[in-house]
Amino acid sequence: LRQPKARISPEQYTRFIKMLWMVTQDEHVGFDVQPRRLGTFAIMCQLIIHAKTLGQALELSSQFYKLFGDEWSVTLERDKHEARLVPLIPKTLDPDHFITESMLMIWHGLASWLIERRLPLERVHFSYPRPAHADEYDALFFAPVMQFVAPRTEITFAADYLDLPIRQDEKTLEEFLKAAPAQLLVK
């Protein structure tokens, strides 16, 4: 952690995040106005696992998290050819963009897991200047286009993916949750 270019493995990151969850008793590890109780993500997953399509699952997930207030949200937008996931997080809660970047990775990883294949991103836009660690984004998002200082932060993919069926079920969800957040990190 003291070396700026050092990397940790997905397994080490998973252990670190789980330790933070236990210490803080907060799935958002202190980055939100109110703690997010442990198990919130699991309940959301139990809700969306019954959706028929990826689009339905992502919309349900978005609606679920809006129940907790307006501080954080992720909105799903769709037009004829493209779909976008747009996180909205107050800059005061996320000055280093850690939560924004984590949310993009988590939602992208969850969508990929639900359809049992990597959801190819067309673009990733960030509303902030290029950070020092931006070279790592290629390994995180695999998007051919990344733009900084964009009007808003969003990930964009082909809208057709929203019509794909959910390929997971309650049994695979149980294993997924035991290992979380590991599967959300590895593409």
Roles of regions detected by a PLM:
Residues 42-48, 88-93, 162-163, 182-183:
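Short hinge/gating elements
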Residues 70, 81, 120, 142, ...:
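A generic structural signal for well-ordered coil/turn residues at beta-strand boundaries
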Residues 119-138:
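Beta-rich nucleic-acid/ligand-interaction surfaces
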